[in-house]
Amino acid sequence: MASLVASIAMAGGFTSKHQSETISVKDALKLNDDAKVVLEGKIKSHIKSDKYEFVDKNSDVIVVEIDNKKWGNVTANEDTLLRIRGEVDKDFTKTKIDVGSVEVVK
């Protein structure tokens, strides 16, 4: 039993404080491809399919891609403050965020 308790206490792994810090859209746009980000803001508009315009508290906008399964149980509208976690996806002309998870900020 003691070994079970010890293994539960040891469960987990390395968590960088930098991966959970919220940054601005402006800062996210400066990061390298595949950089992990956490953003807070609102969905400004639905572009098409799984692409949305996301706006932060500074009114900066970035396109985010949220697959249906990544929404989980979250239902949101233009007034819902969200926290999104994902990766920067840069190509030659555009930068977007591939979203891994969405949660409502309470």
Label the predicted regions:
Residues 1-7:
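Bacterial N-terminal signal peptides
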Residues 7-106:
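OB-fold and OB-like single-stranded nucleic-acid-recognition modules
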